[in-house]
Curated annotation (Swiss-Prot):
InterPro entries according to UniProt: 4_helix_cytokine-like_core (IPR009079), MCSF-1 (IPR008001)
The encoding gene: Csf1
Name the UniProt record assigns to this protein: Macrophage colony-stimulating factor 1
Bias-annotated ranges (Low complexity): 197-207
Sugar-bearing residue positions: 107, 154, 172, 308, 360
Single GO biological process annotation from the record: microglial cell proliferation
Polar residues compositional bias, start-end: 254-267
One Gene Ontology cellular component: extracellular region
Amino acid sequence: MTARGAAGRCPSSTWLGSRLLLVCLLMSRSIAKEVSEHCSHMIGNGHLKVLQQLIDSQMETSCQIAFEFVDQEQLDDPVCYLKKAFFLVQDIIDETMRFKDNTPNANATERLQELSNNLNSCFTKDYEEQNKACVRTFHETPLQLLEKIKNFFNETKNLLEKDWNIFTKNCNNSFAKCSSRDVVTKPDCNCLYPKATPSSDPASASPHQPPAPSMAPLAGLAWDDSQRTEGSSLLPSELPLRIEDPGSAKQRPPRSTCQTLESTEQPNHGDRLTEDSQPHPSAGGPVPGVEDILESSLGTNWVLEEASGEASEGFLTQEAKFSPSTPVGGSIQAETDRPRALSASPFPKSTEDQKPVDITDRPLTEVNPMRPIGQTQNNTPEKTDGTSTLREDHQEPGSPHIATPNPQRVSNSATPVAQLLLPKSHSWGIVLPLGELEGKRSTRDRRSPAELEGGSASEGAARPVARFNSIPLTDTGHVEQHEGSSDPQIPESVFHLLVPGIILVLLTVGGLLFYKWKWRSHRDPQTLDSSVGRPEDSSLTQDEDRQVELPV
């Protein structure tokens, strides 16, 4: 072989390297083709049928299981949703889906485990810091869980058939947008709860109580006065007075037990407590420190007055007969305010050390209509006895009842003052039956001074604090007086005296009976001894008599 021929030939190593490179390229291409064909056709219809058989073999139950799955509401990208759900489905198949060995369901679960392991090559795993993003805990039934798994495999199969490399997408940005773990984005239940309305609203007093009809005439007052009136802090003497017509005295509007003070419906009562010598404050300034006490006392008294159907009728009739010929534009009747008198007078610290004081009521006085409402006259209290009280209680309707300056009621001032200091809560809407109200009221108002002096201290300690109304509801007469006096309320002192007395009487009777029994038992043996000895004596005497008589 010449040198030229040798120089024109290629070395064998060069041909070997090129062949090896060609073989490597062909092999890599075939491997890539096999991988793509493997991912695209990895999920078959047989796997979906297995899942359907698992669903059909489950028992329908309401029991729920807890599992973690992707929150589709937070992750709207379908590719990233399936990519995140794949690793969660693996955990569910390995840990949650447990069946008895060698059963059809256990064999189906093993096939699903093999499928999920083969799909690992088709899914790329993102950073571990986004492992729990877009995931929340679900509480659903096993049927719903299997339905989720079936839908996952079905959607994954469809996407892999279109693009086998679709799950290599980087979803870190989508995962970063999700909120923290276990955050439910569903709207909360809009449950409508009854909201608390302020107490000044008439509709909030009670669902069964209509609004007070006396709210309409208060429209002409100032705003602050009307607000205080609705809040039950405005005194009755600060409200505009009204003159009653004799013809419309018996036409009463519907009554209400709301907590507002019905100023235009209440009659002008003649039974009022006398005022102190100090002048009243103006209408715009309520007395500080006493407003709460007056509010509680006014609420109790006005509710009791509203419960009686005959109270306002009797007083309206008497008021109409007081000045029937007086013109409307002339003088008006200025009533003295009982709660204001209570606020002006000092309160006692305790009621046990004080005796009841008889305070007379002041008759109505005629004043000039141009005179301010808050100005009143000062009177001196007078003491009366129980006979005058009963005489005024049973006065005929035709007789002048208000024009006479004589006192009309005797009331115990210690008891109402103590009752004003004790209660701290309102008793709106608590109305007793009419018969029980009149019985209790007549017992309190028609009790004699001796009974008041004897039982005031003991009753304050024995009985619970009862509601007090210084204005009588109606005149019930002698029959209701006896019925009211039979109220079984025994003071504690009487009880302490009665029990030892009864025990002493029983011991005395027992001692007498025992003494009588002993005396009889002691007398019976003597009678027996005498009876045994006497028949022998009598027989001997009879024989002697016979012997003496025979010779004769």
